[in-house]
Amino acid sequence: MPTGHEWRSSIEGGEFQPSRTRFSRGVVLTSSAVILLIATIILWPIYQFTTSSVSAGDPTPVATNQTEPTIIHPSPTATLTPAATASQALISPTMLPVSPAQVVSSPLQEGLVVLALYEAGHSHLFAYQSMATPYTRLTSGPWNDITPSLSPDGRWLAFASDRSGPWDLYLLDLHSGELTSLTDTPQFEAAPSWSPDGNLLAYESYDQNFEIIIRSVFDDQTLLNLSQHPAADYQPTWSPQGRQLVFVSNRSGEPEIWLADFDEYGDERFSNLSLNPEMQESNPVWSPDGTSLAWAALQERNHSLFIWHPDQGARYVGSGDWPIWDPDSSILLTALRDANQTLLTAYQASDSQLALPPVVLPGSITGLTWGRQPLPSPLPQSLQQIVSEIPELPWSSGSGENSDTQNGREPLAPLINVQAPYPQLHDSVDEAFQALRAKVAAETGWDFLSSLENAFVPLTEPLPPGMGDDWLYTGRAFTFDSLPMNAGWVVMVPEMYGHQTYWRVYIKARFQNGSQGQPMRHIPWNFNARYAGDPLFYEQGGEIGLGIPAGYWVDFTEIAASLGWQRLPALPTWQSAFFAARFNEFFLPNDQSWQEAMFDLYPAEALLTPTPVFPPTLTPTRTPSWPIISTPSP
């Protein structure tokens, strides 16, 4: 095996190899109807035989060259509650209804898929081998494990974790269960990718900027800082031939797919593969046979997957956000994000047919990988102990302790040490709020939710136009204080799903030494631009910011979702009315509709009565008077 110094010199030198009368009219019409009826009776058996023969012999055509992306719209009812997620050591997937004609086959019968799933406030690793078996837990604890990557031989699992404070790389031996630390630095390090021979790892490293680092796996040597560019370079993936590396970079001004060729030197080593300024690409991955690339792209409101071939360019495959290939390079498995849930689906790489119906995952995806070798059987003792562990939610969901059994309604619970116009929430969600508050405070280093713009809002307090049926009236929602935005401590990134706009909220970590949060990869929205005097920015409600904020940030939306709190879409008028953006509102429905939630607090009579709106005070006007002119008496 070549030494670290030999690998470094060979890479740097280009030698590395690894969609008339009434009566008459009545007679005529009646005769026509009789003729049509007789014709129908005679021809119907022939028609039925013909159509049955055609349908039996010809399959339903499937379009392979789509000119416009088709978005998979998941059912909003097919979800798992946080309580169900936390009560299972082996998490079972939830299938969405799909026509059998749409499914080609089940792709998850061979090999091993490892997912990083965010659950109950933390991200952990799970093995997913087929639809018949649930997820098998591989890691557990009060920390986060993300971006897993299986080695070519299937024995080793590299991933990033903050279990020791800063984000470092770790190596899990699936045969023995032994865990080894690969890096120990204050910098953020994640997204490892293996070289074909399994001796090297390429990964992203953040030190005020994202760079691609190549290091040896077994001799603890950092070989090369590949990119060394002022732009952000991240999410590397190694070519199966070993001579090329693909990564995401914003060198051209937006995230695009770039190629690093080890046979070239200087600026000739790097080239832009996607070349599409209208899209934001991410998560590239090589096919195991080395002939194609797949990546995700965001264009306007479409979340799409593309397969790129050097001789054919990029072609659209389907909807998705994070693709991986099966070991035979025939299936693309992908995570598909919706506003408040994540799904798992798959496509045939050759004709884009659906290979796996959408499966609702119990949490959001923070990484996934697919290898040819299954999990060892039996599992090593250390992994068997982890499989049996059950994470617990920091609160118990359900009815509150002070339910009004006399009328079937539940009271409001006070929020201790929280500033708000009405510091109360429904008795069934107040503990969930306090759990979210504590979790965010621990992750960010400051009590972000100690001050709220609104918690419960009584019916006597009218909200702005368009918010007559807002969740704030139910006591199951809150809006955080937007003042930290002015100090640059909170930023929002717009996310488009269908025709609706949602916001992802990031909070700046108090300690910027790498022990809290992660670096951002997206440019936030600048609401203040609407007041800069430019009519265009005013009409569109602001503009995209000038760049990615530096430092470490905590994804508030991610944490809230893992504890059951959902976000609301912006109102259609958000571009002209700041309050309509609703970026700061989160609610916990507990499987209830808005009307059902209102009946928990109010009798039906209260909801049938229109919400009182006080009439405006009449503007006082002076009573006109005519001047009295005295005339002399005769």
Q: Which residue ranges define each predicted feature?
A:
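Mid-length scaffold segments of soluble, non-membrane domains
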Residues: D470-M492
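Catalytic cores and adjacent binding grooves of peptidoglycan-active enzymes
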Residues: I46-Q48, N486-P627, P634
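Structural recognition of the beta-strand scaffold that forms the well-ordered cores
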Residues: F448-S451, A477-S482, R567-A570, E585
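Extracellular/periplasmic catalytic domains that process cell-envelope and extracellular macromolecules
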Residues: P107, D469-G475, A560
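Acidic helix-start/capping segments at beta-turn-to-alpha-helix junctions
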Residues: G445-G466, T573-A580
